[in-house]
Design a protein with these regions (language model features):
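Pepsin/retropepsin-fold aspartyl endopeptidases
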Residues: 2-348
Length: 348
């Protein structure tokens, strides 16, 4: 069965100009940190300071799934190129075809933590990456095959970690805000919404991920992190064992499905339905989840404790999701009704 989400159905295939619909079931792409040897973006440079804190600059937007958004960026004053915003990527990454096209200076190989294992990949130097009115200098970017990225590159947490990142799921829009200046990407991000907002405090993970502890699955407390590039949410096997132990029947039936990562590895995951999932005060009710021991959990030190990767399927349950990196806060706003259709995954 062709993999297709509600977001794709609403937009139509033609709207996905250039983003690979074969997609990555998980966006633990380009590094849940490009491991050792990848330095974070150096000093931030405002290319064109907006005249007021309320001024916004539009960015050409491409969308895939609910939160996989692509912005037009310039690399060393050339472009525009489409880079996908990915909160699961520790480092900003670039496609091999673009790195070769721009003849970017090579850097030493770096260790990249993929979905099932760590791998060594080449990296290049980007002197200046411009995103609308903001420019970031001295980026060390891992390089991946373009077919695996499905875009010209990924904007990772080394850049995103300076912003408040907001996803307007209903309007299929996103915005980045820094020092009161908002950069709008697609749709019409509106202020003054009456949607109730309740922020959850977060801690910072090894590679900049926002780690949440106010999350429970069937009453079991878990450590969770958000990966906006991941199509589906995935729990680790420690979580699976914990919730199975809490059930008198020992657990529900599940079936195996393959999942794939940007570094090319694949592994088998179990699909099952949990009775209750809570994000702070938000009760999501019965929810389908995948379970697998991703390398990402081990990388973040979460292999032996119940943990959950929150992907686009859960983010899409809300009207708005905001990751305020400077203030270590995540806000889920406007919980929507649970869709009645089953999760569409390869093999159905």
């Amino acid at each position: 069965m062709t993999l297709k989400t509600a977001g794709e159905a609403a937009l139509g295939v033609s709207e996905f100009r250039g983003l690979d619909r074969r997609g990555l079931i998980t966006g633990l792409t380009a590094a849940l940190g490009a491991g050792m040897g990848v330095a974070p973006a150096a000093a931030r440079d405002l290319a064109q300071e907006p005249e007021s804190a309320t001024e916004t600059e539009p960015i050409r937007l491409l969308t895939n799934l609910f939160t996989r958004v692509g912005a037009a960026v310039y690399i060393d004053n050339r472009g525009p190129f489409t880079f996908v915003i990915d909160t699961g990527a520790g480092a900003t990454s670039i496609a091999d075809t673009l790195a070769d096209q721009l003849a970017l200076p090579p850097l030493p190989p770096v260790l990249v933590h993929g979905i099932t294992e760590a791998r060594i990949t080449r990296s290049v130097a980007v002197n200046r990456l411009q995103l609308s009115g903001l420019a970031f200098r001295n980026l060390n970017c891992p390089v991946f095959e373009r077919d695996q990225l499905g875009a010209d590159g990924l904007i990772g947490l080394d850049v995103l970690g300076r912003f408040k990142l907001s996803f307007d799921v209903v309007r299929r829009a996103a915005s980045l805000t820094i020092r009161g200046v908002a950069i709008v990407m697609g749709g019409d991000m509106q202020t003054g919404s009456r949607i109730r907002r309740e922020g959850l405090r977060a801690s910072t993970g090894r590679f900049g991920q926002m780690m949440l502890t106010q999350v429970t699955v069937e009453g079991q407390p878990v450590v969770a992190f958000i990966d906006s590039g991941a199509q589906y949410s995935i729990g680790n096997l420690a979580l699976r064992r914990a919730i199975s132990a809490r059930r008198s029947d020992g657990g529900r039936l599940s079936r195996a499905v393959p999942i794939y990562g940007v570094t090319g590895q694949s592994l088998s995951a179990d699909l099952t339905r949990v009775d209750e999932l809570r994000l702070g005060a938000n009760r999501l009710g019965a929810t389908p989840l995948l379970f697998a021991d991703l390398h990402a959990f081990d990388t973040l030190g979460l292999s032996d404790r119940p943990a959950l990767l929150i992907g686009a399927d859960l983010l899409g349950r809300f009207r708005e999701v905001t990751l305020d990196f400077p203030n270590d806060t995540v806000t889920f706003s406007g919980l929507r009704r649970q869709p009645t259709r089953a999760m569409d995954i390869p093999g159905n």
